[in-house]
């Protein structure tokens, strides 16, 4: 296959991807995602791992991030020819072994004996990517590498086949509400006036009222975030519906048809597209595999496999139920969430006006809340489950189990109503010795408030969804300031 293209032809394409070699600037957004600093640190610190892998949904901004890194490295004095950006998804590069492309780069642009930065976009599209990644990890070179993948393949291979310390990984989620506000220059807490989320449990009413007042401007921006603010490319658009059809085509065709069909040999991509659309409509509900399989006329094992494929493409997230103490439940039925509210709403062509319907708003807010809870605890060993009362009297949307006492997040129909003994949520918190419970409202009416009950160790915080998402997103950003984790 390498004989199809001469080195000169390959070099022309490389030059197109790397305009800084000819001292030309590349146009990139000024906004830097939170993980940018961790990536820059990987490229500049000594004794770093050879490869940093960025894994996440298409459209989360990983390609832009690589180009921002390239531009900033060159601007800071790095030899332009020592910075190679490569979109492995390009048809020519997908047909050539990565080693052959790097050979041309070394012979015609930058010698092997000099330090180089490799920015490899969509590396899983590389020909024989598994052996090529091993060569990068163990080969005799002076490369510092950042690679991206929008299908969870490389990370799984690295976990099982390589040594700890040679690589690190970062999960790149969609924009949090906090990042969305920063992107639009709207952060009301930039002056340090707002406390940490956990501090709210110990504040008095006047302090909570002050926090609520400081964050009141967020109310107007939350609907736009829920319907189209999770992706950097759409977050700044005044009308997200303009990008809905484009995103739907990108998600359905490029992710489902191209990525899954190529990497997992899925035989019927149309079934995958139907399943994803069904999960968008029913995001956060318990997914009954048998019922769906019967309706579609396929086997339950096929449906279960398709859900796993969607999860490996970062389109959905499965949340299992939990038994006492966070134990596993036999024959568990998972709740399946679309990974982000924007991913859910774009294919359905939803707009902010649709949030006036209570059921629609609850579905969207539950999806956004789970994204923020998962993002906040993404770097730890915490496990996220849901809980349902055996008698069907109540449920908890997310329980975070870690080394310490569990933390609860649950949407409530009306956060103002009095809770007490006999309420299933309170009883669960008492039995499991929950540290903190967030009673989240999907509307903006309830004020911040703390409740406690005799004999229950848990502190309960009534909090509107937009305030919770702001604080969780900010905490998520703070975690990433410490750098990547292997």
Cite the ranges covered by each PLM segment:
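Interdomain hinge/linker elements that couple catalytic modules in large macromolecular machines
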Residues: 2-24, 187-352, 357-364, 371, ...
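The conserved Walker
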Residues: 58
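Short regulatory helix/loop adjacent to the ATP-binding pocket of P-loop NTPases
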Residues: 153-169, 181-186
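A cross-kingdom feature that marks ATP-driven nucleic-acid transaction machinery
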Residues: 1-29, 47-50, 55, 64-65, ...
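Conserved glycine(s) of the Walker
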Residues: 61
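Structural recognition of the conserved hydrophobic beta-strand(s) that form the central parallel beta-sheet
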Residues: 144-150, 171
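N-terminal pre-P-loop "Q-motif" helix
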Residues: 27-43
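Short glycine-rich substrate-engagement loop in P-loop NTPases that contacts/grips substrate
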Residues: 84-113
